[in-house]
Amino acid sequence: MASTSRLDNNKVCCYAHPESPLIEDYRAGDMICSECGLVVGDRVIDVGSEWRTFSNEKSGVDPSRVGGPENPLLSGGDLSTIIGPGTGSASFDAFGAPKYQNRRTMSSSDRSLISAFKEISSMADRINLPKTIVDRANNLFKQVHDGKNLKGRSNDAKASACLYIACRQEGVPRTFKEICAVSKISKKEIGRCFKLTLKALETSVDLITTADFMCRFCANLDLPNMVQRAATHIAKKAVEMDIVPGRSPISVAAAAIYMASQASEHKRSQKEIGDIAGVADVTIRQSYKLMYPHAAKLFPEDFKFTTPIDQLPQM
């Protein structure tokens, strides 16, 4: 009985028409008496499903009851003040256009972050990187931005370096030249910013190896698996035998692809490989020259030669 009394006490009703049903206006958040129109409750929460608004809908009513998703990386929780349209003459400028409609106030820090996040997303789209890498790059940029350790470096340079680091950390490394191709920053500046970012965040990245690039390079060159496996084996053996000391993994991978392709029927030129790997022809030749005298030891035993080793190009 006591329970029933408590329920009765908590019941919302019109004081003039307690028995009249109430109309719930979820858009306004009000409960209205159906008899006299009195608002007897406000701030009603709609527990129904959310609606989306599409740009081609002609109705002026927006069924959405919430704004865009919050971004936890922004300092203000992604909340900002929006000034709606006014009704008085002071709300319009000399040309009759609304002065303040949809004007948004946002901190300079958040504006800087949003601009950098857009740049990271744009670069990632152009080289087909997944959202997981974009999210990691955004987090790295946020840490650098909050730490204020890279003063004097442009946001574009920091964004490019963070995207490069994110690729390395996610196990899908890209070369500096690939990042530079979709960035507004020079390769040299990205390299500098990369080192400064690692130092500022007190983090590290795994060393890149020839295997990190082999699959992608061979796929872009339209080479079959047989050539890819041979090139991977050649590059790995060359490193293990210390044939190419001081050479970058990218140049070793490119030279190994050149050697494997020249021994098969799927031959690729130094220029074709260089364009894909982002290295100069002379760089490929220098690594190939070191590897050629040991070619017999570098190829896998089951490789089917179309061109014998003694007929391979000599530099």
UniProtKB/Swiss-Prot annotation:
Q: Which SUPFAM superfamilies match?
A: Cyclin-like, Zinc beta-ribbon
Which positions does UniProt annotate for Zn(2+) binding?
A: 14, 17, 33, 36
Which of UniProt's keywords are assigned here? Answer: Metal-binding, Nucleus, Repeat, Transcription, Transcription regulation, Zinc, Zinc-finger
Spell out the PROSITE patterns in the cross-references: TFIIB, ZF_TFIIB
Where does this protein reside within or beyond the cell?
Answer: Nucleus
InterPro entries reported in the protein's UniProt record: Cyclin-like_dom, Cyclin-like_sf, TFIIB, TFIIB_CS, TFIIB_cyclin, Znf_TFIIB
Q: Extract the GO molecular function terms from the UniProt entry.
A: acetyltransferase activity; RNA polymerase II general transcription initiation factor activity; TBP-class protein binding; zinc ion binding
Briefly, what is this protein's role? General factor that plays a major role in the activation of eukaryotic genes transcribed by RNA polymerase II.
Quaternary structure note = Belongs to the TFIID complex which is composed of TATA binding protein (Tbp) and a number of TBP-associated factors (Tafs). Associates with TFIID-IIA (DA complex) to form TFIID-IIA-IIB (DAB-complex) which is then recognized by polymerase II.
Q: What is this protein called?
A: Transcription initiation factor IIB
